[in-house]
């Protein structure tokens, strides 16, 4: 058993893949073989330990990342099982931010799929070392070697087999270990027992070929391996493992394994690879933070006796303990009941309880240390991306960035009592999920909820109705348009109200500038303290930001703009914060009137897999939807169409594609960017928005 304070024996890993590649089934087998659970859960029966939400059990998919931990051969493994559906990519993003390594799971039939690419790029961004596991080797059409080629080509990764399958499809019966040069045959259904044997002549020939490929790849990065390889000297399994570990941790090589998690084959060897090749907290570069006192960047080393530094990466509601805050400890230690400092919020927080999570089950602990991932109860003001640290050593970690929502749904309470419950429920859900947002429509007064896709909002609404017991009328999904500007413009407003007694006075001059796509909203103060005292600047910014929530074309949020406060004036007696907030809001509205406002719409990356005989119809339909073809790729029996299409044109696409291809095509899509809406479509949006004839 590993001591949780022995950092060399800790592995913090994530499990990531496209939907239906077998992530949760693999996690269930890991928990069973490690002794963490005593019965295997099954996704299709709704009994998976990690899919504990009712919405996950009903749909057979993972919706929220679930944390657990197990022990394997003296190592302590923290595991986060992440969703594979594009609507829940935020769960992958925030998990990878705090993990040291990951397992990328690929279906042996489908290979690299669209969401496989998305999560792989996310792991690239955070420099997370990973191993690849080609699952479902028992399925008809399984091709281990084809999937390795896809990983190399589509993911630009140096994928190298360290195992070979024995048999394929129904004949898949075991695994060849290229490092130990042994065969392992599974004989019982549970997979708990497997027999080791020597390789037969045919297996030996194939294994030698791939072992040489492995050694050649290692020799590129390891001089000691290169020297022995060139001199034809024997290289021991221990030397290969040591070299492979270094190459994996430095993201030079991705070791590739195989198995069938559902048929209980290959999972124990996958666990061996996790502890052998993925890093401990000591093996990865120390994380950077800003020292608040000096303003300089410092490196936070994973030391138990150092000052505390931790990152809150996930919030969740628990029916028994209330708000749970998940966090990764980078240095120091935390005790239950201790007080710490939230440096982003600039306030103290106190833990009442510390918990080790196993999906939705809680294990109370007294202390947690550097390298660990735990949950805390009692943090009232901490949000996702906040830094928790010692009060005598204030540091700030880089926060976590999340994509903007792309789809809206109107929601309306059935009674006044439900209205209050809706507002509180939505606040809690938005606290948990940074890609879920709420706002009130200025025109209709309706509450608008926004998310990453139809399934995302469907799950949110289901939770509102079932978990929070809210009675509400739900509208149809709508595109979450944004507004922006194309022209630089300025406006000047004097707000002067005198109505007996003390008046209100504020004078502001604002300039509005367009920004490139994805730059968000910026506010800059270039006024002089003599024109506007510094204490009124936050009120000006607040007025600007509130006014940006509703543009002048259709009342949609304004984005990709910079608003600059150029100047103004004040009155020593009559000026106050509310006056400057009102003046700033009025000036911004006036500036937007002259800034050539436009609509921005979400554009989706679309990939369609279809038989060749339907290709013409699929492309014609895509063109009619304002789509643009980017690439056509050959698969074994199908064509892959990759393109861009506005989200507004994709509602009901699943039904249309089924009709066009007699149900023989599939598609997936994810947000690419926001782009300007053509003028003809803009007129349609305005007409629909205000109930005018289109």
UniProtKB/Swiss-Prot annotation:
Matching SUPFAM superfamilies: EF-G C-terminal domain-like, P-loop containing nucleoside triphosphate hydrolases, Ribosomal protein S5 domain 2-like, Translation proteins
SMART domains (alphabetical): EFG_C (SM00838), EFG_IV (SM00889)
Subcellular localization(s) per the UniProt record: Cytoplasm
UniProt keyword terms in alphabetical order: Cytoplasm, Elongation factor, GTP-binding, Nucleotide-binding, Protein biosynthesis
UniProt KW Glycosyltransferase keyword: no
Primary role: Catalyzes the GTP-dependent ribosomal translocation step during translation elongation. During this step, the ribosome changes from the pre-translocational (PRE) to the post-translocational (POST) state as the newly formed A-site-bound peptidyl-tRNA and P-site-bound deacylated tRNA move to the P and E sites, respectively. Catalyzes the coordinated movement of the two tRNA molecules, the mRNA and conformational changes in the ribosome.
Assigned protein family: Belongs to the TRAFAC class translation factor GTPase superfamily. Classic translation factor GTPase family. EF-G/EF-2 subfamily.
Protein name per UniProt: Elongation factor G 2
Species, as recorded: Syntrophomonas wolfei subsp. wolfei (strain DSM 2245B / Goettingen)
Classification of source organism: Bacteria, Bacillati, Bacillota, Clostridia, Eubacteriales
Name of the gene encoding the protein in the UniProt record: fusA2
